[in-house]
Swiss-Prot record:
Its EC number is 3.1.1.73. It is found in: Secreted. The keyword Isomerase does not apply. Coiled coil: none annotated. The gene is faeB-2. This is Probable feruloyl esterase B-2. Involved in degradation of plant cell walls. Hydrolyzes the feruloyl-arabinose ester bond in arabinoxylans as well as the feruloyl-galactose and feruloyl-arabinose ester bonds in pectin. Residues 1-18 form the signal peptide.
Length: 526
C-alpha cells in the first residue's frame, strides 16, 4: 500500500480521534457549566467503554463495589437538595453514541441504592440516563426514622427530581437536547414508574414498569403476614425448603398441562387452583419426605389465599402458585420479612424496638390509614397520562416470589373499571404482559430473558427487548403484540434453550402444536 493510499485511512482515523477528543474535552469542562438551583456537583469524569468502574461511595448493603460499562460516556455525580433537610444523590451518564433519548432508572426494595447496572445497560443502548439513591443510602429502612422528608423522597420526589434535573443537564450537554423520554424500572422501580404516570403524567413518553410494588402499604403488610401463617422454623405450621419443593412439585403436576404442554411451566396461574390435600402424609407413614402434615397443608392453603383486612376488605390478592421454591427462602423462611419489619418500625410506629413477630391484621389497618405521601401508588385514573400521549408497558413474572403477579392483574382491572375502558381501548396506551417462568424481575424456570436489564439481555431488537419495544411503540407507533422471552441454559450470556412469546393480557398462552413446546410458534395467544 502506498503512502498516498494511506491518506484516506489516516484522515478517517484523525476525524474519529478528534471526535473522541472533542467529547472528552466537553466532558472535562462540563462541570463548570452546571449552575442549577439546589444542584451540587461532586465530580465529572470521562469513562471509556470497557472500564470496570469502581464505586467506593456505594453503600456496602447495595452489593455493588464496581460496574463494567460498555460505552464511552461522561459521568456526572451530584447531590440535589429536595428540602432543607433532605437530598438525593444523583448520577447522569451521557454516552458518546447518543440516540437523542432521555431515560430515568428506578430503585428496588426500600433501598437507597443507585442501580448502576441499569445506568450501564441503558447508557450502552444510547440513552442519556439518570439514576438516584432515593434520598438515603443502603437497603435498610432506618433512614426513614423520624425523617418524613426522606420518606417523601422515597415515595415520589427522588425520581421526579432526578427527571427534572436530568432533562436540564441533557439539554446542556447535547446541543440537540432530547426527542423522547423514557423510564425503566422493576419492583420498587415499577411502582416509581406508575407513580410518575399518576402524579407527573408529562415526565415520560414511554414507561416500562416491571413487577410494580404498587398497592405498596398493603404489599408491606401482605409480606409480613406470611410469618403469622408459617410461624417460626420450630412451629408445626412451618415448612422447610424441602417441604416446599414437595408442594411445588405437586402444584406443577396438577397445573402444568392445563396449557396443553408438559414443560414444567404454568402459563396461566389464574387457572391453577391446586388441591394440596393430595400430599398429606398417610396415617402411620414411615417415609414423610414426600408428603406434608395437615397443619402444613393448612399453611399452604392460607399462603395461596387472598389477604383480607379487619373489615373483610381485600387488601392484597393471593400469592400465585408456582413461586414456592423461590419464596421459601425469603417470605416463608420462619422470620418476619425484613423490609416489612423496617417499614413498621421506622415509618408506621416510629419505634425501633417494635416486635415484628407480634404483627396482626389490625396493624395493617394502621399502616394503610397512614399511607404517607400516598405511597400506595394505587390511583386507577391515569387519563392524564393517556391524554398526554404516554405509553406504559408493564410486565410481571408469574413465578414472582416477592410481589404477586395477581396484584398487577388487579390494578389492570381497577384501571379498566375506573376509566370505563375495555382491553382494546386500554391497548392504545397501556399493555400488560404476564411472563410465565419469570421470578422477581429476573431469573426463573422459563423464558424470562426479555431485555429489561443486563441480567435478561438477549439482543437489542424490539422483538427481543422490552425497552426497545417501548421505543418502537413511542417513536414508530408499532405497539408490541407480545414480548419474547429467552430461556437460558445457565443464565444470561449462555446458550438459549428456547424462546417464547408472552401474551398481552388478558390473552393467555396455549400450546397448539405441531412441534415441541420449545417452538415458540407452537403456542397461540387466546
Amino acid at each position: 500500500m502506498t503512502k498516498l493510499s494511506l491518506l484516506p485511512l489516516l484522515t478517517l482515523a484523525s476525524a474519529v480521534l478528534a471526535k473522541q477528543d472533542a467529547f472528552q474535552a466537553k466532558c472535562a469542562s462540563f462541570g463548570r457549566k452546571i449552575k442549577l438551583p439546589n444542584v451540587h456537583v461532586n465530580f465529572v469524569e470521562y469513562v471509556p467503554g470497557g472500564t470496570n468502574l469502581t464505586l467506593p461511595d456505594n453503600d456496602v448493603t447495595c452489593g455493588a463495589s464496581s460496574q463494567v460499562v460498555s460505552a464511552d460516556m461522561c459521568r456526572v455525580a451530584m447531590a440535589v437538595d429536595t428540602s432543607k433537610s433532605s437530598q438525593i444523590t444523583l448520577e447522569a451518564w451521557f454516552p458518546r453514541e447518543y440516540t437523542g433519548r432521555f431515560l430515568s432508572t428506578g430503585n428496588g426494595g426500600l433501598s437507597g441504592c443507585i442501580q448502576y447496572y441499569d445506568l450501564a445497560y441503558t447508557a450502552g443502548l444510547g440513552f442519556a440516563t439518570v439514576g438516584a439513591n432515593n434520598g438515603h443510602n443502603g437497603t435498610s429502612g432506618k433512614p426513614f426514622y423520624q425523617h418524613p422528608e426522606v420518606i417523601e423522597d422515597f415515595a415520589y420526589r427522588s425520581i421526579h427530581t432526578g427527571v427534572v434535573v436530568g432533562k436540564q443537564l441533557t439539554k446542556m450537554f447535547y446541543k440537540e437536547g432530547f426527542d423522547k423520554s423514557y423510564y425503566l424500572g422493576c419492583s420498587t422501580g415499577g411502582r416509581q414508574g406508575f407513580k410518575s404516570i399518576q402524579k407527573y403524567p408529562n415526565d415520560f413518553d414511554g414507561v416500562v414498569a416491571g413487577a410494580p410494588a404498587f398497592n405498596f402499604v398493603n404489599l408491606i403488610s401482605w409480606s409480613i403476614h406470611f410469618y403469622s401463617i408459617t410461624g417460626s422454623n420450630t412451629s408445626d405450621t412451618y415448612l422447610s425448603p424441602e417441604s416446599w419443593k414437595v408442594v411445588h412439585d405437586e402444584i406443577v403436576r396438577q397445573c402444568d398441562e392445563i396449557d396443553g404442554a408438559k414443560d414444567g411451566i404454568i402459563e396461566d396461574t389464574d387457572l391453577c387452583q391446586p388441591v394440596i390435600e393430595t400430599i398429606i402424609c398417610k396415617p402411620g407413614a414411615s417415609d414423610k419426605t414426600n408428603c406434608i402434615t395437615g397443619a402444613q397443608a393448612k399453611t399452604v392453603r392460607n399462603v395461596l389465599s387472598p389477604f383480607y383486612g379487619v373489615n373483610g376488605t381485600l387488601l392484597y390478592p393471593r400469592m400465585q402458585p408456582g413461586s414456592e421454591l423461590f419464596a421459601s427462602s425469603v417470605v416463608y423462611n420462619g422470620q418476619p420479612f425484613r423490609y416489612s419489619t423496617d417499614w413498621y418500625r421506622y415509618v408506621v410506629y416510629n419505634n425501633p424496638d417494635w416486635d415484628a413477630t407480634k404483627w396482626t391484621v389490625e396493624d395493617a389497618a394502621v399502616a394503610l390509614a397512614q399511607n404517607p405521601y400516598n405511597i400506595q401508588t394505587w390511583d386507577a385514573d391515569i387519563s392524564s397520562f393517556q391524554k398526554a400521549g404516554g405509553k406504559v408497558l408493564t410486565y410481571h413474572g408469574m413465578q414472582d416470589q416477592l410481589i404477586s403477579s395477581d396484584n398487577s392483574k388487579l390494578y389492570y382491572a381497577r384501571v379498566a373499571e375506573e376509566m370505563g375502558l375495555g382491553p382494546e381501548e386500554l391497548d392504545d396506551f397501556y399493555r400488560f404482559f404476564p411472563v410465565s417462568g419469570m421470578a422477581h424481575c429476573t431469573g426463573g424456570d422459563g423464558a424470562y430473558g426479555i431485555g429489561n436489564g443486563l441480567r435478561t439481555y438477549n439482543g437489542a431488537e424490539p422483538e427481543n427487548n422490552v425497552l426497545m419495544a417501548m421505543v418502537q411503540w413511542v417513536e414508530k407507533g408499532i405497539a408490541p403484540e407480545f414480548i419474547r422471552g429467552a430461556k437460558f441454559s445457565n443464565g444470561v450470556g449462555s446458550s438459549v434453550e428456547y424462546t417464547r412469546k408472552h401474551c398481552r393480557y388478558p390473552r393467555r398462552n396455549v400450546y397448539k402444536g405441531p412441534g415441541n413446546y420449545s417452538d415458540e410458534n407452537a403456542w397461540e395467544c387466546v
